[in-house]
Amino acid sequence: TARTDSSFGIGATYVTTAGDSTVTIGAGFADSTTNTSGTQLVSDAGGMHIGVTAVTGDLTIGVGYADGDTFTDDGAAVADANTQVDGTVVKAGVKYVSGDITLNIGAVSGEAKDSTTTGTAGTTDDAWDEVNASVSYAVASGVSAVLGYTTVDVQDEGASDTSGGSAWYVGATMSF
């Protein structure tokens, strides 16, 4: 079992205009101290993030970066012992609206090293790389048709994992 002894978080957002664009910058930091029964972890959970978005008319562009560490307790079995995870992620996206049509493209790239030897960073990377693109068309008020594509590449302990792949999708979104 785990108990959080203390935690804190702080963040800030700044919004400004630059010509015809509205720019938003946000950042934050959080940390916590946790005690566990059994093996005491020496690396507590914490992290930071920063992101920027810019909106110019019908075009929105955003990018963000996060870095942090945490631990998980996946159970009592030896294979599920306490695991320390140190990781980073970068996300970026672009959206363009033209009348009833919206185009979206986004990318995510995350990397982490995990270790069951708490306090010691892992030596091989787990990774998740994803790209998504979609086109939606406003069919009626509150109803949009969507056509999209996504591709995901996953690595576990430095080797390709079969949970990744690519797919086309067709759907609808509704808002009331």
Task: List the predicted regions and their residue ranges.
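Outer-membrane beta-barrel proteins
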Residues: 1-176
